Structure formats: C-alpha cells, structure tokens
C-alpha cells in the first residue's frame, strides 16, 4: 500500500467535525491494535492532525503484526510494537483509551485464515480487557455488522437490540462468531469487572486506504476500472448494502470513544440501500463514464454465503450526538475514484 492512504481534505473534514471535542483528548494516550489497518490508520492520522492544535500532545502506542512505510509511524508521538497482538503480554503503556481494531475483516482473507480470525477476536480481546481493567482505561471493541448475520425483513434497518440470525458452521462463521464472543467478553468485563467499554458495529465502511487486494466491493470495482476491465458482480447482484464513507464513520467512532454513554453502537449509513446493479449505475452517473459489468460465481477462495440485506438503524447515534452522515454516496464514489486512480 502506497503510504498516501488518505485524502488530506478527508482528514481535515474529520478534524473539523470533532472540533468541539478536541480539548477532551489533548494530552491523552491511546493504545491502538490493528494500527496498520484501514480504520486504525485513520484514527492515528486524525489524532496526529489534532496534535497540531496543542502543545499538550496526544501519545499513541501502535500495535500490528506489520507496518507499511508510512509517515504516521515515524512521528515522535507514535510508538510502534511490531508483533502479533495475540502474543503480547506486557504493553508498558499507561493509556486513557484502548482501541482494539485488530482483525481480519475481508471475507477473502478470513476465509483463508479462519483460526487466526477467531482468536484475534477472543484471545487478544481478553488480554486487552484485562489491561484496561488494570490501568482503568476505556476499552473500545471494533466489532462488525456481521454479528447480525442475515436479518429477516422485519429487522431491517437493524437495531442494536437485534440478536442476529447467524450460523456457527459456515464459511463466514470464523469472523461472525469470533466477533460475537468478543462482544460477550466486553459485556461481562463491563458488568462484572466494571471496565469502561463500548462496542462499534461498522456497516460497510469504505474509503481511500482500502488495500487493492481487499476483495470487498469498492476495492474490487475500482481496481477493475483502473485496469479498464469490466467490474465483477457476484451471482445475481441482488444483495443490498448501505455504504458509509470513511470520514463519517471515523467521526462517529471518535464521538463514541470520547463521549459515548452507551454500550453498543451501529456505525454506518441508513440510506440509500443499494443492490450491486444500482451501485454500478450510480458509479457510472457519478463518474460520467461507461463502466461494463459481468456477473460471476463466487470464487473458490471466497465465502459462498453472504447476507442478502444489510442496513443499520443509527437512531442511537443520531439522538445522542445529533449525528448525520454528511458525504453522499455520489460524492463518496468520486472521492474513492480520485484516490484509487492514483494509488491502485
């Protein structure tokens, strides 16, 4: 991944969205697992940008199994630990917030690494919860909308109170069930051990910085566009999603991290709900260009079953923070295209 994983204007937008909360995190310390991942990088970049507004610097401990050659990790306010999060027993970093973003969220990758996927959501989560208790830090668990499985029609848009319709013995189960157990750990540490804790359930967050080999819909489509090849739509393309641009998602996540009073939050966009054919049409309209498409079967190295609909109820975010998604799907497509045209 090229080290320019973001649009500078996107980072400025996130920082501006959070301006009333800057003083609350001046001088704070953040431990971030999965620091080299898509969301982890955005958290670090945003915190470092906020650092420009104060002499009381925010400090970051960044943990990941590998790190790109990225300017983030060369900053004097960032300390790196290059190691598997499951194998770390001593962090030596007294912090205010622990953000557990480590995981394997891409279906192609967790299909090929199911055991590692499960234990990152369980072993590492327990270790970090124990550490949060020890140092009295607020713990944030990056879960997933996957924990809802394949909701029935009456539970879409899906509320945080929906218990899910999830199989424990399918290709996606390593990720879905791992996250569900991770959430259960958070629940009992919160009520039994009194750990300050919140959970994010992101719904189809996308934006600059997604790896070209991620295999989720936006990297896959835009990689094909860059190569002037038809985009590939799995099966009929009738499965629907709502998509949340990264600036809106990171803004919501920071709001919960800094000031969230509740336990579980859906993070995403509640409209529009699009099937892949409609997304293809919007891409052509937004970019003002003809883009060919073909329908294909799921590849052998990709889970053969996926939710048919995915759309969050984000009433909790709206009520608690007066939150609203600011970046439309049309604008999101333009921004992703602008970035991927240069870096894919």
Name what the model sees in each region.
Residues 1-30:
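Non-catalytic terminal and boundary segments that flank Rossmann-like NAD(P)-dependent oxidoreductase
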Residues 29-49:
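N-terminal Rossmann NAD(P)H-binding glycine-rich loop of SDR-like oxidoreductase domains
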Residues 85-120:
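NAD(P)H-binding glycine-rich loop region in Rossmannoid oxidoreductase-like domains
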Residues 100, 126-172:
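Conserved Rossmann-fold NAD(P)-dependent oxidoreductase catalytic core, especially the SDR/UDP-sugar
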Residues 144, 183-208, 219:
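Conserved beta-loop-beta element that borders a ligand/cofactor-binding pocket
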Residues 174-181:
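Active-site helix of classical SDR
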């Amino acid at each position: 991944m090229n080290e320019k994983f973001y649009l500078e204007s996107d980072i400025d937008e996130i920082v501006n969205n959070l301006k009333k909360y800057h003083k609350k995190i001046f001088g704070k310390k953040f431990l971030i697992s999965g620091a080299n991942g898509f969301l982890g990088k955005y958290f670090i970049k945003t915190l470092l940008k906020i650092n420009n507004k104060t002499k009381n610097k925010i400090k970051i401990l960044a943990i990941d199994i590998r790190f790109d050659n990225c300017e983030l990790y060369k900053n004097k306010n960032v300390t790196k630990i290059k190691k598997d999060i499951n194998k770390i027993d001593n962090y030596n970093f007294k912090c205010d917030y622990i953000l557990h973003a480590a995981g394997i969220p891409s279906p192609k990758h967790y299909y090929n690494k199911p055991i590692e996927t499960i234990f990152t959501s369980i072993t590492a989560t327990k270790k970090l919860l124990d550490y949060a208790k020890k140092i009295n830090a607020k713990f944030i668990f990056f879960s997933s909308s996957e924990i809802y499985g394949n909701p029935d029609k009456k539970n879409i848009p899906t509320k945080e109170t929906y218990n899910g319709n999830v199989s424990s013995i399918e290709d996606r189960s390593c990720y879905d069930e791992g996250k569900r157990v991770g959430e259960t750990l958070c629940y009992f540490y919160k009520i039994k051990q009194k750990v300050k804790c919140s959970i994010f359930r992101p719904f189809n967050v996308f934006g600059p910085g997604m790896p070209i080999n991620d295999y989720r819909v936006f990297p896959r489509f835009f990689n094909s566009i860059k190569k002037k090849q038809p985009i590939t739509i799995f099966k009929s393309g009738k499965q629907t999603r709502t998509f949340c641009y990264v600036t809106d998602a990171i803004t919501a996540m920071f709001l919960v991290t800094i000031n969230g009073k509740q336990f579980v939050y859906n993070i995403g966009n509640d409209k529009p709900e699009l099937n892949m054919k409609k997304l293809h049409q919007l891409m052509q309209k937004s970019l003002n260009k003809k883009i060919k498409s073909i329908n294909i079967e799921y590849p052998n190295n990709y889970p053969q079953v996926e939710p048919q609909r995915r759309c969050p109820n984000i009433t909790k975010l709206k009520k608690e923070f007066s939150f609203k998604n600011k970046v439309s799907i049309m604008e999101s497509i333009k921004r992703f295209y602008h970035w991927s045209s240069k870096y894919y």
